[in-house]
Regions:
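Hydrophobic ligand-binding cavity/cleft-lining segments
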Residues: 1-49, 53
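Hydrophobic pocket/interface hotspot
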Residues: 27, 37, 54, 87, ...
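A short, structured loop/turn motif at beta-sheet edges
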Residues: 24-25, 47-50, 88-94, 113-123
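Hydrophobic/aromatic beta-strand elements that line small-molecule binding cavities or substrate pockets
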Residues: 18, 44, 82-88, 109-116
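Beta-strand/loop substructures that line and gate deep hydrophobic ligand-binding cavities in soluble
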Residues: 99-152
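A conserved amphipathic terminal alpha-helix motif
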Residues: 129-182
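Short beta-edge strand/loop motif at the mouth of beta-sheet-based domains
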Residues: 15, 35-80, 166-170
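Short beta-strand segments that buttress and anchor functional surface loops
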Residues: 54-56, 71-74, 97-103, 126
Length: 182
């Protein structure tokens, strides 16, 4: 389950399911605390309330110890990138949603659902909606989330993650095949 590709339940939507080592409180901290969020996604505060600000300070080179080149089409992100969203749902240890304005310049929305499982495991369901239908955007966003989730799992399991761009490049190729065949 933890390496499966995301699925596209409807146009402009990507959904991932991952089984994570819990408990839910631990996963919630990785979603909402800047110092933990920075280890797998991006630094930035999350104001703990509906309507609260969510900061995204991306610097992909900080997500692993690996020094690797940034692909040419992402070179504009070399020194990092910043944007903000707003919390649209805040149900601690269960569900977090916020707006996301980076992919197309349009506002999309990300939802994380945490479902407790046996043996201190947590099923994470990540859904990103309102992405539009541009295949280039869908490929990039799908590969990005897939890569960030690989890094999250490594962090939760105490493993040093592989370089972001090496994984992302591979995932982009795979999602290009998947989306190109839709």
């Amino acid at each position: 389950m933890n390496q499966k590709h995301g699925v596209f339940p409807e146009p402009g939507t990507i959904r991932f399911e991952r089984l994570l080592p819990g408990p839910p409180e631990r996963i919630w901290d990785y979603l909402t605390k800047s110092e933990l969020k920075a280890t797998w996604l991006s630094a930035g505060d999350v104001e703990p309330r509906v309507g609260g600000k969510v900061e995204f300070r991306f610097k992909h080179s900080d997500l692993s110890e690996t020094d690797e080149p940034i692909p040419g089409k992402y070179r504009h992100m070399q020194d990092g990138t910043y944007f903000e969203g707003k919390v649209t749902e805040w149900d601690p240890y269960t569900k977090l949603s916020y707006t996301w304005g980076e992919a197309t310049g349009e506002v999309s929305e990300v939802t994380y659902e945490l479902i407790p499982q046996k043996n201190e495991k947590v099923l994470l369901i990540l859904t990103h909606v309102h992405l539009g239908e541009d295949p280039t955007v869908l490929i990039s966003v799908s590969a990005g989330w897939h890569t960030h989730l690989v890094i999250l799992i490594d962090r939760l399991e105490g493993i040093s993650p592989k370089g972001f761009w090496a994984v992302h490049n591979k995932m982009e190729e795979e999602y290009e095949r998947l989306i190109g065949n839709k």
